């Protein structure tokens, strides 16, 4: 199997191309979510179908991520990265001119194919060009770009929709994508690159694609379709299990695997990957719950939610360069443990929010979470790959990033189901106290009827107001339960830290392998 060769060319140009591409791809994931209601209104799409705008992208994204290392060896960094940027840019333009929901979903799938390649490839390009002594700061700078995207996405999306239309959340990618593709093509030099001549593992690629698409569909649509009460979900779940298990067995047996699972023989890597899965669960599922709580309970607009994340996450931008310097100078396991405690604490704080939460109460958990993520992000990657051979790190890095994405998808599906079921159960429990003969209920009912005394039927209006208050209280309790469940699940990840081995070698070398 051909080894990845060092990259030459303009360091500034390569940095600009890598950062622009990564920032664009990461922003696009979050910027679309704030536009779903406008897209739905534009196309007249049913509420249960509009989610395919995000689902189609996610399916393509998770399929391409583990294959990116193979494509890099096959076509080279410059050709693959520039080609992925152009595909992403073209698909963005097509999304803006989509004429109905099916056409938009198809174009989003094309966009996901390009986007799934951009993040891992831009990381490899950046660390392939910088000398080892500069890898620590290069990693911190890249992390800043990757983290800035989710913070800016909702804010930029909300502004564009307010002043123009949803079409511009896609059109804004066109000049950025063209610039990044042009700069990468003229800057990246691979004079010693020789394309891999290994046979194409068509069977492995096919099994992976079918399995990941089926799995992502189940995770995205399962709660909406009643999970295993729907035969389509049952069929696709079985398809995902059969294809992915067969894929793993096939990759372990074939002499030229498209994804090398043998890296899991390394205990430290396996523990770090499991921990990364839980990080993805806590991060994405926690953000999902927080945004949903702010929107449904506190009635925040999408732009207001984006500003909440922006105000609470500035500490992350300051912490990343500091952590980049600490990696290798102190025991990375201590940094990871501190980060886990911070993320767990933020989920615990979220678990005590109420319908009366003010801006300070909403911002504090985001601040604490950002602090924890700042300490966990880079050292976890370094520890994961520190005990692996350089030839193993390509597949290992792809799998490592994929587990975080899968953790987010599974965690979000889990929390979506939990909130629905918990809210119903809490509403049933609270209804037992809505007894007309209960003195406390009678007092609250009189207050409610007094609040609507000027309405035509204050008695019935009072009962309706009490019912809405019970619904709201049940929803708040459901969200609290979801956050606290996530906190408990993520706190368990502290035990995985004991399985991590102290990295050997220079921080620069390890940081290079981590990316």
Predicted features along the sequence, with ranges:
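Residue-level hotspots within transmembrane alpha-helices of multi-pass secondary transporters
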Residues: 34, 66-67, 151, 155, ...
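Short, Lys/Arg-rich, polar N-terminal cytosolic tail immediately upstream
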Residues: 1-7
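Small-residue-rich alpha-helical segments with characteristic i,i+4
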Residues: 137, 142, 148-154, 158, ...
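C-terminal membrane-cytosol helix-exit motif in multi-pass small-molecule transporters
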Residues: 175-193, 210-221, 239-253, 493-501
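Hydrophobic transmembrane architecture of multi-pass small-molecule transporters
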Residues: 35, 49, 179, 404-502, ...
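Short helix-capping/hinge motifs at transmembrane helix termini and TM-loop junctions
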Residues: 99, 131, 187-190, 223-224, ...
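Transmembrane core module of solute transporters
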Residues: 10-85, 92, 102-104, 143-145, ...
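Helix-loop-helix hairpins in multi-pass membrane proteins, especially solute transporters
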Residues: 65-205
């Amino acid at each position: 199997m051909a080894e990845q060769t060092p990259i030459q060319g303009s360091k500034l140009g390569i940095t600009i191309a890598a950062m622009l591409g990564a920032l664009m791809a990461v922003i696009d994931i979050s910027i679309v979510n704030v536009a779903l209601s406008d897209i739905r209104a534009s196309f007249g799409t049913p509420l249960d179908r509009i989610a395919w705008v995000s689902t189609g992208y996610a399916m393509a994204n998770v399929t391409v991520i583990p294959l990116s290392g193979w494509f890099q060896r096959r076509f080279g960094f410059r050709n693959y990265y520039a080609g992925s940027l152009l595909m992403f840019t073209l698909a963005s333009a097509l999304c803006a001119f989509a004429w109905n929901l099916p056409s938009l979903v198809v174009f989003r799938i094309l966009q996901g194919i390009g986007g799934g390649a951009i993040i891992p490839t831009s990381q490899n390009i950046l660390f392939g060009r910088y000398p080892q002594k500069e890898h620590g700061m290069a990693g911190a700078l890249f992390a800043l770009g990757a983290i800035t995207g989710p913070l800016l996405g909702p804010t930029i999306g909300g502004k564009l929709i307010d002043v123009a239309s949803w079409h511009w959340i896609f059109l804004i990618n066109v000049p950025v994508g063209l610039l990044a593709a042009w700069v990468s093509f003229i800057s990246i030099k691979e004079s010693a690159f020789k394309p891999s001549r290994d046979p194409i593992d068509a069977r492995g690629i096919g099994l992976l694609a079918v399995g990941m698409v089926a799995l992502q569909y189940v995770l995205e649509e399962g709660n909406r379709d009643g999970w295993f009460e729907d035969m389509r979900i049952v069929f696709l779940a079985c398809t995902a299990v059969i294809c992915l298990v067969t894929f793993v067995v096939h990759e372990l047996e074939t002499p030229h695997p498209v994804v090398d699972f043998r890296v899991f023989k390394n205990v430290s890597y396996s523990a770090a990957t499991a921990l990364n899965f839980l990080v993805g669960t806590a991060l994405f599922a926690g953000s999902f719950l927080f945004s949903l709580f702010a929107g449904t309970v506190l009635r925040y607009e999408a732009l207001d939610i984006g500003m909440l994340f922006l105000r609470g996450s500035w500490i992350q931008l300051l912490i990343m360069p500091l952590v980049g310097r600490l990696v290798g100078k102190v025991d990375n396991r201590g940094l990871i443990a501190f980060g886990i405690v911070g993320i767990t604490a933020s989920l615990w704080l979220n678990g005590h929010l109420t319908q009366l939460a003010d801006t300070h109460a909403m911002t504090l958990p985001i601040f604490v979470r950002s602090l924890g993520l700042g300490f966990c992000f880079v050292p976890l990657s370094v520890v994961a790959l520190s005990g692996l051979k350089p030839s193993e790190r390509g597949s290992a890095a792809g799998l490592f990033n994929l587990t975080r994405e899968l953790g987010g998808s599974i965690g979000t599906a889990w929390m979506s189901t939990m909130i629905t079921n918990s809210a119903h159960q809490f509403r049933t429990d609270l209804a037992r106290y809505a007894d007309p003969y209960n003195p406390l209920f009678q007092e609250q009912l009189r207050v409610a009827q007094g609040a609507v005394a000027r309405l035509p039927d204050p008695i019935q209006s009072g009962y309706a107001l009490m019912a809405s208050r019970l619904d709201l209280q049940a929803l708040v309790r459901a969200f609290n339960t979801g956050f606290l469940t996530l906190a408990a699940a993520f706190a368990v990840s502290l035990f995985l830290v004991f399985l991590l081995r102290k990295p050997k070698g220079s921080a620069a070398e390890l940081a290079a392998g981590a990316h």
